[in-house]
């Protein structure tokens, strides 16, 4: 969960839509349209989602690797407590009750194919097994997402290890196939529940990942999934290039391309006003999703208009919005702008902030109808995170219920 799409970010404003309660009709109302949510921070840990666990590990704990090392012999017991309590059947029931169809469950290679000498602990697959049972009981389908690869495919903390992207070096790709093989053998034949297997999350060419070897990995990974169960979709990442850049790429299997859309991970993005955020969201659907020859899903997105959530940019990083991040632009930063926004509930937002959040969410829902579906990031957080915590947004009426209800109709027309 980093960077996201920087496409279509024209700074031309829109007029504000008049608030009306109405029903919006998707141009793609097919039964296979995905409306899902990520279970982030559960089986792959992230500091901003569960800050308390990382704080227990001290200042050195900035990702799951360093957290596990810092906790030492206590790591397995502490993480097992988290795995066993963070998500339950009642969460899946509430997700289904909100009109969603899928959950995307991130998991790291270390959970299924640990490498000797690394500090990670295991036990996550027991809860992934439980999650599939919960999904079956609730009537949800599952996207199993290989979120962290050996060496790190992007250098982000959510890959398991913050730092250089060393995937594709040494034996890391071969080690990734071992992890993928376990996931496929264990889950690809869960017909009716496991709907997709995501081969790798957010490989990042700008960090040194080579695209041609990535394509080879996609082809071989897709062949493995297809051999196990041709009905399970293979999900490939657009690698921050935009889905239309992959037009014509064929892995020889039922394929979905995954793109992520965030508008908070640069000074230019957090400086935009609500009209510009809405326009950027609408442009993304028209410029990328509608032009993709491969069925495209927005595998991660949110309603955040700032990067203020504590640790969102990293364990010891500030925010661009208020000027406390090293990459901030002092010309556009808002001093003290993150007051009331670092955590807690969306209920504490001002009326204007609530309206803007709802409007931005609706625009994205409308825009993403140009694709094959979406997965919101993320279902819940430990301390709350306005704009990210879907469970909280639902409770505060900032996420449409039912999903096709609109207060701001026709924003992307």
From Swiss-Prot:
Keywords: Cell adhesion, Cell wall, Cell wall biogenesis/degradation, Disulfide bond, Glycosidase, Hydrolase, Secreted, Signal, Transferase. This is Probable glucan 1,3-beta-glucosidase ARB_04467. Belongs to the glycosyl hydrolase 5 (cellulase A) family. Monomer. Major glucan 1,3-beta-glucosidase required for cell wall integrity. Beta-glucanases participate in the metabolism of beta-glucan, the main structural component of the cell wall. Can also function biosynthetically as a transglycosylase. Functions to deliver glucan from the cell to the extracellular matrix. Involved in cell-substrate and cell-cell adhesion. Its EC number is 2.4.1.-, 3.2.1.58. Residues 1-17 form the signal peptide. GO terms for molecular function: glucan exo-1,3-beta-glucosidase activity; transferase activity. It catalyses: Successive hydrolysis of beta-D-glucose units from the non-reducing ends of (1->3)-beta-D-glucans, releasing alpha-glucose. Pfam families: Cellulase. Disulfide bonds join 282-412.
